[in-house]
Amino acid sequence: LSEIRVSGNGRLRPGYVTSRLWPDTEAPFNTNLLQERFLLLLQDPLIQRMDGGIRPGADPGEAVLDMNVVRERPYGLTVAGDNRRPPSTGSLGGMATAWLRNLTGYGDFLDVSYGASEGASEVDAGWSFLLNSRDTRLSARYSYSENSVVEEPLKSIDIESESESFDVTLVHPFYRTLRHNLEMGAVLSLRESKTFLLGTPFSFSAGDENGKSRVTVLRLVQSYVDRTTDHALALRSTFSIGLDLLDATVHGGGVPDGKYFAWLGQAQYAHRLGEKLGSLVLRGDAQLASDRLLTLEQFALGGATTVRGYRENELVRDNGFDVSAEWRYPLWRASSEGGSDKLLQAACFMDFGSAWNKGEDPWDNRLHSAGLGLLWESKWLDAQFYWAYDIEEAPPRQDYDLQDDGIHFRVVFHY
């Protein structure tokens, strides 16, 4: 293969396509290898469609590949509303996210988000870009949030907090086929939290220094995805090592601080049972820590993404796990012009989890629920509504919230 000619690529640089299709033009031509790389490139979010043809080159034994690339839309906007926040700062809220792909022409991705509820606001921004044709990716992300307690009886004493984080991530795909993807990487994470009472710094958690805690963490990440037409399996493992660097909070003597070791494991499996039987979704998370942790790094349990039927962050501890099984049954499906589907599904599920600090019995703080849900998926709108019954009864609250009745919902508009 002596040459690859790319057309229709717009701002996407031709080298982005050619280096992934055939990085070594001197290598012997292999149709099967080219086809696999072609199909892998079709999975790239920058590309909507590709058409190619091979013709003889100028010299005997040479071939030229003509490629016509149709780019995917390089920008987008999502607006979401839900009740997936802790009631103490206002569970009802919204978030808007704008994103832009390929700003430089080298496959980078830029996104900015802003979210707010009655007592909270947050800003999040990230930029990632590819370092080479092997898709080694470097990314940076910054987030900042302000929170005020708006729930009685604590609202009147003016409790506030600020959180800030900055992450730098380097990830490389070590093995990639049309079915499998194995990635490993490292993250340097800087996180800081400040808490205030009546406008004055105040410590509410063990390990804080005058209302302030700070961690510098090295995270080693491994992820694996196995995907076919009938199932998808995603596994992720994160080893976190708290470092005594960059003014991290360090005490010693058994007091929670930023010098620690912890492991977080995450798994999700989805299996299509058949066109009329729907799908089965299994999920699980677990965190184990060798030491007492600052609140910044603890495991949060309860709410829409862990154990439904309870308040968001019902339990916050050093260690914890949650598992979930959900069956989704299709009620109605329709295909519209342009090939986009509309799907309405009913769901039934069961969630279970536990969280504990070092030295505590893991079974003393259990959350267990079962319930029903309704899900809508379409090109422009996704919506979820879940109701769950708390089998392990939650403690009564003075201020009522929808989450106390096991109601969790989310609506997302895509543009």
Where are these regions (language model features)?
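Transmembrane beta-strand segments that form the barrel wall of outer-membrane beta-barrel proteins
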Residues: 75-85, 96-102, 106-118, 123-125, ...
